[in-house]
Amino acid sequence: MAKVRVYEYAKAIDVSSKDIIAALKDMNVEVNNHMATLEDDTVKKLDAIYKKAKAKETANEKPAEQKKQSSNKINDRKKNDVQNNQFNKNKKNNNQNKNKNKRGGNNKSQHQQARPVKPKKELPEKIEFTNSMTVGQLAEELGKETAEIIKKLMMLGVMATINQELDKDTVELIASEYGVPVEEVIILEETELEKYEVEDKEEDMQVRPPVVTIMGHVDHGKTTLLDSIRKTKVVEGEAGGITQHIGAYQIEENGKKITFLDTPGHAAFTTMRARGAEVTDTTILVVAADDGVMPQTVEAINHAKAAEVPIIVAVNKIDKPTANPDRVMQELTEHGLVPEAWGGETIFVPLSAKTGEGIDELIEMILLVSEVGELKANPNRAAKGTVIEAELDKGRGSVATLLVQTGTLHVGDPIVVGNTFGRVRAMVNDIGRRVKTAGPSTPVEITGLNDVPNAGDQFLVFKDEKTARQVGEARASKQLDEQRSDKAKLSLDDLFEQIKQGEVKDINLIVKADVQGSAEALTAALQKIEVEGVKVKIIHTGVGAITESDIILASASNAIVIGFNVRPDGNAKSTAETENVDIRLHRIIYKVIDEIEAAMKGMLDPEYEEKVIGQVEVRQTFKVSKIGTIAGGYVTEGTITRDSGIRLIRDGVVIFEGEVDVLKRFKDDVKEVSQGYECGITIKKYNDIREGDVMESFVMQEIERK
């Protein structure tokens, strides 16, 4: 007979898992959690207990009612006795307190009369201060002479005057000499969102959907698993099979919703993955059964453990002939994830994202873990949550993907998001439909902000737009002041370091990406590169096309510009050529890291180099059946050839990269079209061409090894 798990038995007899665990403890049967298995003897004992309980319930309904009434009377009498006793006690205490107060009052008046004598002041129970404290203030708080405090400071090697400010550590040291504890009181500024927070009452809390993060190594099948769950295709078209942006999606199973955060799997996305773990309730760790534990798998485990989030291991690709789930279990045991089959507490679900096997069991486990976790939020309050992703859209302006964590977000709500503010103009859910409200654990994309926030920023809804504007502007102003002071410090520190160390090899980089999350992740990854004698210094990061100002900054700082999924505009290109600034353009994150790392080690030895040979401005489009979309364009630069690669750029962002299918001049097929002439172009297997797009023609040229 197959062994039954605690939760399965509970489900079968319609009792909660917690009740079963409690009953087992009374029987002296030790179980760790709801996933523990039950022996046949234990099941029989439980059956006997619950059958007896049901029989008693039906037989003793009337006596129970009578008992209840009599017990209520007894309880009422007991309550009255307790209240009378309490009243008498309170009377006594009040009289004692009055006498004490009188005595205290007499002492107080005696102290006031004896003030000229200046008796020794008693040490306080504790000292409270904000930010810092002067020597004079500390002496007054301790009831000591200023000279005595200055003497103590001199013994510690600190030369100070009466009005000199002391930091927290020094205040603590001096206070500890007198045995007085110190507490720093943090006063929330107008710019702190916590100041406008409202505490939720327990009775207002309601069950909310779980937020699940899918983590794991690159190419282990995270996005395919999510795709299998959602039953829609989101993998196709992603460069190198790596998810480039964090997406948030919601599914519904048996009337219960689950929100998924899809964090990219490559080690470069450390910051994005860490940010995902901050808002998540459960982590699904995807490990390929044919590949085992990899560096990014270990990294994902550490993030989930640091966030104290329960981990469910999804052993993927079990349909492959080389799959070995036992090896995965063995390797994960070394990292503290022991399967419940081996006496541990970690849930392991073998599955195949490709065939769909094991998906239902995984969803059941997610709902079970969330049920045990008792996830709750108050939906009837001003919304609060976190930014998952943000970008600047030419048509819609600032667009931010938000995850509502508590409260309900409405269209028209005044909102502060990080250092930006605005009013929620429109809300779109994960399937692209416009919605008017979004409750707890719901991901939505909003427009209406005055600027692009940073991924990971907190947001809060305010009562009126005026307050939201004031707080948003104050936060932006504060950030600007901090940046200015940091920059001033940095330049001075760098100058000192160079004088002190002599020659320091620095690689200055400017990072531009299509979305904030990619820029953040790329910056973090590049700063992690460690090569002896060489330092990486990110002097600027931004979102959007590479502009002329980026090139001027690079020229002044002797920096290399890295574009991820973005292109330089016309002015930037010409300025880069004039100023001799190196621009590196990439679509795959790890290629950027490999290239920079190789350059730092002095091992970069490219064999081929991309050369842009021409540019076409799309002025009109024609849709023809069996052919697709034909772009009518004007060659603004260089030459377009039929055998060259073609890149479609929209608003400075690369939309597609492929090959020229047909190149025509009037009705004739031609091999090339030069600058100043019109032409017709079709792109192989791609039809989404629009007026105003730019096509860039390029070839790969072999260059000499140096």
From Swiss-Prot:
Residues 316-319 are annotated as: G4. GTP binds at residues 216-223, 262-266, 316-319. Residues 352-354 are annotated as: G5. Residues 241-245 are annotated as: G2. GO terms for cellular component: cytosol. InterPro entries: EF-G-like_DII, EFTu-like_2, IF2_II, IF2_N, P-loop_NTPase, Small_GTP-bd, T_Tr_GTP-bd_dom, TF_IF2_bacterial-like. Residues 216-223 are annotated as: G1. The keyword Transmembrane helix does not apply. Residues 207-376 form the tr-type G domain. Residues 82-98 have a biased composition (Low complexity). Residues 55-81 have a biased composition (Basic and acidic residues). Belongs to the TRAFAC class translation factor GTPase superfamily. Classic translation factor GTPase family. IF-2 subfamily. This is Translation initiation factor IF-2. It comes from Bacillus pumilus (strain SAFR-032). The lineage of its organism: Bacteria, Bacillati, Bacillota, Bacilli, Bacillales. The gene is infB.
